């Protein structure tokens, strides 16, 4: 009896020690997808806001199968012609096209949450104004990257929630937000495809202007859009709107300075678990 009590006491003391010593260890004290609201308007914070917007695309939501933007890419694979759905495997609802037509489906809600939260973060970065000493190249680069990412998100939404632009530019697509939202912001109705693509081209051209001269400093920054990435997005937007000459020109600009990868370098992009 005494031994049992001693064992319980020892276990309890050990548990309390573990909890007290590491209770805060697992907390992210410097989250990459959030910024203190009190310093959001500061120009020097624009880069952190863009980083938060980007890392938001990796956020899990509602199920282990919603693994950020990668889940939406898998969803597209399932809705295309190259993948066959198997029992007991995720994305069956994508295979049946339920993910884009059923409002109550968790991936439908996830796609809107992921895209519009990222857009809202970009809107916050874009809304910051700078004058004098605050108007630095780094500030302009961060805003350019926010413009590029916002255009990328709207390209995704335009392709998923309406038929092609060439079928009907006046067709309603998705809501268009270009300003940060707050709790009292009234929901917007659907913008037309023409309105959406007008904003997309405007954002990409602005991004191209702001990112002139930007060079990624290291591999840790390769997620940040540069002018080549913006030209790639411009080529995609031109293709989707039937501007074939513009698509070719933008694609050639995007490819400048790059050579085809060797087999060895190509394999370096994959994990080797063995």
Language-model regions, residue ranges each:
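Membrane-proximal, proline-rich intrinsically disordered regions
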Residues: 22-73, 251
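Bacterial N-terminal signal peptides that target proteins for export
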Residues: 1-11
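Bacterial N-terminal signal peptides
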Residues: 11-20
């Amino acid at each position: 009896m005494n031994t049992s009590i001693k064992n319980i006491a020892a276990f309890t003391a050990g548990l309390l020690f573990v909890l007290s010593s590491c209770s805060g260890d697992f907390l992210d004290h410097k989250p990459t997808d959030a910024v203190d609201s009190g310093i959001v308007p500061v120009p020097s914070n624009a880069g952190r806001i863009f980083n938060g917007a980007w890392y938001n695309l990796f956020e899990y939501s509602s199920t282990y199968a919603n693994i950020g933007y990668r889940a939406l890419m898998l969803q597209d694979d399932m809705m295309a012609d190259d993948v066959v759905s198997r029992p007991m495997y995720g994305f069956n609802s994508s295979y049946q096209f339920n993910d884009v037509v059923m409002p109550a489906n968790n991936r439908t809600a996830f796609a809107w949450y992921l895209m519009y939260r990222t857009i809202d973060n970009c809107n916050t970065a874009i809304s910051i104004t700078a004058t004098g000493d605050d108007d630095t190249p780094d500030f302009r680069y961060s805003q350019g990257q926010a413009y590029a990412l916002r255009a990328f998100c709207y390209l995704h939404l335009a392709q998923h929630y309406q038929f092609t632009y060439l079928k009907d530019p006046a067709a309603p697509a998705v809501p268009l937000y270009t300003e940060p939202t707050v709790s009292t912001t009234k929901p917007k109705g659907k913008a037309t495809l023409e309105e959406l693509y007008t904003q997309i081209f405007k954002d990409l051209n602005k991004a191209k202007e702001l990112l002139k001269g930007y060079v990624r400093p290291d591999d840790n920054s390769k997620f940040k859009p540069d002018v080549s990435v913006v030209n790639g997005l411009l080529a995609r937007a031109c293709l989707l709107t039937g501007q074939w000459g513009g698509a070719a020109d933008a694609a050639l600009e995007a490819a400048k300075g790059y050579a085809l990868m060797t087999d060895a370098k190509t394999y370096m992009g994959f994990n080797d678990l063995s």
